[in-house]
């Protein structure tokens, strides 16, 4: 999702921090060719890695144009990492 503009506020930053994720890490996952799945309620689930190799799930919504709003992010479970690696082959 190179070229996306990220929308956020203090509330988003605090929410990510509760999950141990820095906003820059969430953005890095989205910029690093993630595996993206769409949910029934128009949210997107991005499975990917940071530059440091950390595996994260980033939940986001697309806004107007190139704007993306990250809702939450967390570490992938071991099962999710395994599935991510399999689908990335």
Give the positions of each predicted feature.
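Ribonuclease/tRNase effector modules and their secretory precursors
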Residues: 1-89
């Amino acid at each position: 999702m190179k070229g996306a503009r990220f929308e956020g506020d203090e509330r988003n930053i605090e929410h990510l921090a509760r999950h141990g994720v820095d906003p820059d890490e969430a953005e890095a996952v989205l910029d690093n060719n993630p595996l993206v799945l769409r949910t029934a309620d128009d949210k997107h689930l991005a499975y990917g890695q940071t530059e440091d190799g950390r595996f994260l799930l980033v939940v986001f919504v697309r806004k107007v144009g190139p704007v993306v709003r990250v809702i939450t992010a967390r570490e992938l479970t071991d099962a999710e990492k395994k599935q991510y690696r399999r689908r990335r082959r």
